[in-house]
Design a protein with these regions (language model features):
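Structural and coupling elements of P-loop NTPases
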Residues: 1-690
């Protein structure tokens, strides 16, 4: 069945891990009649969590699209993971949604995941609605949670449905719009008398009326005259407030026991904006272009998620903003400027894929086997090429080195990782030019563990992880002059080269070469060979075999043989001079230093500063950021940062994040030299290069 954009609601379901997002999505799907049996996260039978790792871990790891069709309205629910290592799912889903349904556990209250979901909605100018789950449990405290929300989310919070525990221990739900109460028997709604909740009832009605009055001048006037709003006025005012961002309505219920979900679904329809009201703003030739959900307009479709399947191929999840998308549509990729050949169009519900002739404006679907399109791309009618903004992903700061488990799989790793990165843009992969290690980056330990499992299960590539090597450097502290004399007689022409070279420390991280030879003791045509020998030798320091930096080599004197001297002979002579001089020039180890910017709540700044000092770092200052966090700026050795991702997450309960970028090299403390040298020996860094 096709839906007009006014009858489509695209909703990101977000919140803390374990708060009940997936169970709520499953319950709404079951309520719509799309499934005969309600799945359970514990059993691995929900529509949302179908990935083998999700089933094994009993937690969402990827965003999934679950369309719920109910009473003429299509709700495209995008179930986002709540675990902090998988925030990419919410970052993708928000790009396809007009609204965010924030789930809050009736047991745990307002946790960090709920705060992050609220902030994500604010940043992206999306309508917000809260659903407090598990309110039928004995230890659930709705009104305590409501106060938490007012503190964390501010004055926009407005309760619309509240629970009341009855004498028999069951829970009834009071709809403040209609001022009627209901209990649920086997998921079926039964109206009852409104339970007595004391002074709270009048206070809740008053607070709701005030919030609604502020959305419209006529309603404000009626409110001040002391007149009660009609149910229609309440709904209209509430909808206006939700769509403008003035009001965050709060509902509650139980997904497991199918309680108050009918009220939630009804109000998702009447309060949240439809796909027809959500205009997108793209860019064409540097100018902003507004796109409306008009099926007759030129095609504009956004790729918000990619799944790499080794059997089916690439599956691109798409929201059509205007026009219609079908396999015969002409489309240009705004990023590449090239035509994009479209595969078959699909509707998707979890892992279930169904062919559909087209995806209409405002709706979400998928396209198979797009050749070049990736997440964040815009597909357009060639007559109107518009680029929409790319998703903003969390920063991947947790780095590990890749080690192939099976011999012969080395060539498969980069290809498999490239496929994985298509579906998870928070995974990064590079080959370190110096250490030659393959480095994979992600959001944390769990993130990389799941990435490894996907590589094995999807692409048959098994890898393990190890701590990345630190790219140390070596330098010298004082000047030293030495001779390098290379003489070899092998019958016929021999080899002869003789040089005196002065080695001295200089500023910077390069190798400088100069010559100060008088009288032709070393012919000019051999100067490049001497420089080449010095530079080759400097690739390996004498302490731990790391590259030498901050050194100047000056050719002072030497001698040559008119027959036996050659370029190779002077290269070897320069290397011998290097090996003779550097041990006497006060060799030192240098370690890389990075600039740390840790974004943390104000309460955590003292702990961060202490941790920086503990890690041999220096705090440089502190400034607020645009999100209300404090940015602690510091410089810290790279070697001390390997587990900082885990530390920061535990300290801030997931609220904080950081960036870390290389700045320069500094002298390694002498007390640490022996350990680094020992590690270098184990790696074979000190192999003779002659």
């Amino acid at each position: 069945m096709g839906y007009a954009s006014k009858d489509i609601r695209n909703i990101l379901v977000a919140g803390h891990a374990g708060c009940g997002k997936t169970t709520l999505t499953e319950a709404l799907l079951y309520m719509s009649g799309a499934t005969e049996r309600m799945g359970r996260v514990e059993d691995g039978t929900t529509a949302s969590d179908f990935d083998p790792e999700e089933i094994r871990r009993k937690a969402s790891l990827n965003s999934s699209v679950v369309p719920v069709e109910y009473e003429g309205v299509k709700y495209n629910l995008i179930d986002a993971p709540g675990l902090f290592d998988f925030e990419t799912g919410a970052a993708e889903g928000i790009m396809a949604a007009e609204s965010v349904l924030i789930c809050v556990s009736g047991r745990s209250g307002v946790t960090v995941g709920a705060e992050k979901a609220y902030q994500l909605a604010l940043k992206n100018n999306k309508a917000r609605m809260v659903f407090v789950t598990k309110t039928d449990l004995e230890n659930a405290d709705y009104f305590k949670i409501l106060e938490q929300m007012k503190i964390k989310f501010g004055p926009s919070v407005c309760p619309c449905v509240v629970p009341a525990r009855l004498d028999d221990g069951t829970v009834a739900y009071i709809n403040l719009f209609s001022q009627k109460a209901f209990k649920y028997e086997g998921g079926k709604q039964v109206q009852i008398d409104v339970p007595d909740i004391g002074h709270r009832f009048e206070g809740l009605i008053q607070a709701m009326s005030e919030a609604i009055a502020e959305t419209d001048e006529a309603l404000m006037e009626k409110f001040f005259e002391g007149e009660a709003f009609t149910t229609e006025e309440i709904v209209q005012g509430m909808a206006a407030g939700v769509r403008s961002g003035q009001i965050t309505p709060v509902f509650c219920g139980s997904a497991v026991n199918m309680q108050a979900l009918d009220m939630l679904l009804y109000n998702m329809n009447v309060l949240l904006p439809g796909a027809d009201t959500a205009a997108a703003v793209g860019e064409a030739n540097g100018e902003p272009v507004e796109i409306t959900a008009d099926p007759a307009a030129p095609l504009c479709a956004y790729v918000f998620k990619t799944v790499a399947d080794p059997f089916v191929g690439k599956l691109s999840f798409i929201k059509v903003l205007s026009g219609k998308l079908s396999a015969t549509s002409s489309a240009v990729n705004a990023r590449t400027g090239q035509p994009e050949r479209l595969g078959k169009t699909l509707t998707v519900c979890g892992k279930k894929q169904t062919d559909t002739p087209e995806i209409a404006a405002g709706d979400i679907g998928a396209v198979a086997k797009l050749a070049t399109a990736k997440t964040g791309d815009t597909l357009c009618d060639p007559a109107r090429v518009v680029a929409l903004p790319a998703p903003v992903y969390p920063i991947s700061c947790y780095r590990m080195a890749v080690k192939v488990a099976k011999k012969g799989d080395e060539g498969k790793v980069s290809g498999a990782l490239a496929r994985l990165m298509e579906e998870d843009p928070a995974i990064n992969f590079v080959v370190d030019a110096e250490t030659k290690q393959q480095i994979i980056s992600g959001l944390g330990t769990q993130h990389l563990e799941v990435a490894l499992a996907k590589l094995k299960n999807k692409f048959g590539v098994e890898i393990t992880l190890e701590t990345p090597r630190v790219p140390y450097r070596e330098s010298i502290r004082k000047s030293c002059k030495a001779q390098g004399r290379h003489k070899k007689q092998t019958g016929g022409h021999g080899q002869f080269g003789d040089v005196w070279i002065q080695f001295e420390p200089v500023e910077g991280e390069g190798i400088e070469f100069a010559e100060n030879v008088f009288g032709g003791s070393v012919p000019k045509n051999f100067f490049p060979a001497v420089e080449k020998g010095v530079r080759q030798a400097a690739e390996h320091g004498v302490l731990a075999g790391y590259p030498m930096v901050g050194m100047k080599a000056t050719l002072l004197d030497g001698s040559y043989h008119p027959v036996d001297s050659s370029e190779m002979a002077f290269i070897m002579a320069a290397k011998l001079a290097y090996k003779a001089a550097i041990p006497e020039a006060g060799p030192i180890l240098l370690e890389p230093i990075g600039a740390l910017k840790a974004h943390v709540p104000a309460d955590n700044t003292g702990d961060i500063m202490g941790e920086v000092t503990k890690r041999r770092g220096r705090v440089l200052g502190m400034n607020p950021d645009e999100d209300g966090l404090q940015v602690v700026e510091a410089e810290v050795p790279v070697a001390e940062m390997q587990d900082f991702t885990t530390f920061l997450r535990q300290l801030t309960q997931g609220r904080g994040y950081f960036t870390f970028d290389f700045v320069r090299y500094e002298t390694l403390p002498q007390m640490l030299e022996a350990k680094v040298i020992e590690q270098a020996k184990a790696l074979g860094n000190l192999a003779d290069d002659e």
